[in-house]
């Protein structure tokens, strides 16, 4: 089964392929030249679901093929005014992951915080017929740590700062296979795969 992944991020494509490879339901995830074909998709929703739905609708309406989109972010319960659906552009619209991490480090330092509870959230939206959209949600609880000893120069998202619950290491220090068993995206993808399996 071919499903278009509503992203231009090759790293995200690789992650979805890895997450689904052990499924009994064979999926061929592909990415398309969205910017060239559709143009910039404005994610102006007020929730992860709304942003994922905007992307999924735009891609489905153009290609008329099954589409899976996701929107994800980091939430800090003690600092609800930051991050969330704006996590990927915390330091600016075109900010890099590295820039976002350093801005978060500086922000929390200014509040004299050494660690704070946190959770990653991922919402998937799947469209396979016109007007039919299903959503799947995964959450990953833990904490953000603040330290000058962190290596914030490399890594994905806020992984170099995020320590999952019941762990003593950051996500960046975990193996990819270990992360893919317990991450927020893994949980959402597993729900999606179970839906496909039950739908057969």
Swiss-Prot record:
Its cofactor is Mg(2+). One of its GO terms (cellular component) is cytosol. The keyword ATP-binding does not apply. GO terms for molecular function: dITP diphosphatase activity; ITP diphosphatase activity; metal ion binding; nucleotide binding; ribonucleoside triphosphate phosphatase activity; XTP diphosphatase activity. It catalyses: XTP + H2O = XMP + diphosphate + H(+); dITP + H2O = dIMP + diphosphate + H(+); ITP + H2O = IMP + diphosphate + H(+). It comes from Malacoplasma penetrans (strain HF-2) (Mycoplasma penetrans). Gene3D superfamilies: 3.90.950.10. CDD domains: HAM1 (cd00515). Homodimer. Keywords: Hydrolase, Magnesium, Metal-binding, Nucleotide metabolism, Nucleotide-binding. GO terms for biological process: nucleotide metabolic process; purine nucleoside triphosphate catabolic process. This is dITP/XTP pyrophosphatase. Belongs to the HAM1 NTPase family. Its EC number is 3.6.1.66.
């Amino acid at each position: 089964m071919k499903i278009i992944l509503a992203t231009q991020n090759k790293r995200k494509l690789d992650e979805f392929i890895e997450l689904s490879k052990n499924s009994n339901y064979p999926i061929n995830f592909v990415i398309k030249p969205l910017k060239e074909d559709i143009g910039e998709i404005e994610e102006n929703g007020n929730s992860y679901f709304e942003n994922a739905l905007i992307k999924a609708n735009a891609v489905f309406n153009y290609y008329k093929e099954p589409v899976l989109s996701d929107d994800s972010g980091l939430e800090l319960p003690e600092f609800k005014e930051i991050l969330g659906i704006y996590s990927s552009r915390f330091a600016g619209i075109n900010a890099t992951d590295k820039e976002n991490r350093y801005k978060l480090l500086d922000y929390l330092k200014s509040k004299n915080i050494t660690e704070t509870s946190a959770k990653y959230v991922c919402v998937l939206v799947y469209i396979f017929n016109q007007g039919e959209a299903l959503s799947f949600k995964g959450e990953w609880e833990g904490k953000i740590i603040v330290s000058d000893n962190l290596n914030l120069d490399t890594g994905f998202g806020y992984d170099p700062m995020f320590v999952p619950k019941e762990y003593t290491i950051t996500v960046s220090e975990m193996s990819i296979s270990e992360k893919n068993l317990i991450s927020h995206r893994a949980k959402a993808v597993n729900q999606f795969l179970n839906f496909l399996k039950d739908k057969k």
